[in-house]
């Protein structure tokens, strides 16, 4: 069973939508079109999470697409411009938008004419989502843009907690789950996925002349920043990758070991993608720069579907 056949019936509702600035200003834009826009953003820039989201129940799927589209927009800011001030302005737009959304007795007419912002307003009001979790998705990216590196592996872990875990906390709120064990699992999964994202971004970050691998690990294994920027494979580099991947895997195992409410398991389905990457990296003896890591996994769609049916993650 291939990727396209398995997900074809789910992909059909999300037609490719291109929305111009003029179109965004129209108050008549229907809810379905806005959701399609969010879905296309996630599909284009966060495909693995998009596939996992399609396997969620209908009631959770649309809010999940909105939250992930918001996260994509925030995460992409640093890739869209090399000018730090412009990037900060774009992040400030979203911080200001959140302030507007959370004003008492707010009307959608006062929300910026942006489909993601308007859909975010709707789900925040419908589900009483915590503003601080949405704020974290922005401020974590803003802080990284200023520092441009991580001093320690613990700093990477904190960044992962702040830039990924909030999505899971918010989705649990949408699902009506108020459970300390589910929150604990969400924290560990966010850390696992966030740390893995750092590993996966090493090549891209190197292209932008940024070293995202923690300095303490590089120093411990005698790897220079220049070696990272040149994508130099070596035993020492693999030792760095091994330690970082081990931390991610430890959090993944913790997330999976916790007994959580049944509905939470579909929310935590991206754990399968994290496991796939870490397993592949291990088979490559932790060579971060192997070209096969750039290829999508042919078995991932089946694994997501299989684990969804079994209610596992």
What are these regions (language model features)?
Residues 2-14, 18-142, 160-172, 182-195, ...:
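Catalytic cores of Mg2+-dependent Asp-rich isoprenoid enzymes
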Residues 145-153:
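Cytochrome P450 catalytic-domain "roof"
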Residues 156:
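Conserved donor sugar-nucleotide recognition element shared by glycan-biosynthetic enzymes
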